[in-house]
Curated annotation (Swiss-Prot):
InterPro entries per the UniProt record, alphabetical: MPN, RadC_JAB, RuvA_2-like, UPF0758, UPF0758_CS, UPF0758_N
Coiled coil: none
Name of the protein: UPF0758 protein BCE33L4198
Alphabetical keyword list: Hydrolase, Metal-binding, Metalloprotease, Protease, Zinc
Length: 225
């Protein structure tokens, strides 16, 4: 089996990582360090290349399932599990930066808080951030996964968590898998319904942010709130 030790010395990614730091490694080299070994037919770097090619780079690889990974020749359950665990740790580390009572002062703060987690999602996720009186995030909840419409996103589910957490206000977010954050008619209808319910029960819906690919739209800034 071809492992990292079998690669030509100047191409050994683990040794380069130790000498030059992880930031000096390419995507294929970092992947090789995680995989550790290749197969009888190919080196670990060639296996890395094959995986990256199969998923068209990191964008699709980050959401790869166990079944998709093991379908690649040379990747077994153990290697696939290592990769999936590494990707999940990466996502959690990104979130850690913002979990210490992150304060939201404007739509940009809100988009920055959720952008990296939501912009690559393959389905629409409707998420609520629950804030205290200082506009600090005290909880977040995924309310619904799927195409957004006013009959599915029920105010009861949104405000139930607000009462549980004694939240002072709410910010709603959802992503557009197309990457285009332009609001649809349904997006606007859902927003207006939630805002009206919030007014009645005394928990303000501050904004509804639509996440695209490194772009976002604030429905408050657009005048829909």
């Amino acid at each position: 089996m071809n492992g990292i030790r079998d690669v030509v010395k100047e191409e050994q990614p683990r040794e380069r990582l130790l000498l030059e730091g992880a930031g000096s490694l390419s995507n294929r080299e970092l992947l090789a360090v995680l995989l550790r070994t290749g197969s009888k037919e190919e080196s670990v770097l060639k296996l890395s290349d094959k995986i990256l090619h199969h998923f068209d780079g990191l964008r699709m690889l980050k959401d790869a399932t166990l079944e998709e990974l093991v379908s690649i020749h040379g990747v077994g359950v153990a290697k696939a599990s290592q990769l999936i665990a590494a990707f999940e740790l990466g996502r959690r580390m990104v979130r850690l930066e913002y979990q210490n009572r992150y304060s939201i002062r404007n739509p940009e703060d809100c988009a920055r808080y959720m952008m990296e987690e939501m912009r690559f999602l393959q389905q629409e996720h409707f998420v609520c951030l629950y804030l205290n009186t200082k506009n600090q995030v005290i909880h977040r909840q995924t309310i619904f996964i799927g195409s957004l419409n006013s009959s599915i996103v029920h105010p009861r589910e949104v405000f139930k968590e607000a009462f549980r957490r004694a939240a002072a206000s709410i910010i709603c977010l959802h992503n557009h898998p197309s990457g285009d954050p332009a609001p649809s008619r349904e997006d606007i209808e859902v927003t207006k319904r939630l805002v009206e319910c919030g007014r009645i029960i005394g928990i303000e819906v501050l904004d509804h942010i639509i996440i695209g690919d490194h772009k976002f739209v604030s429905l408050k800034e657009k005048g829909h709130i």
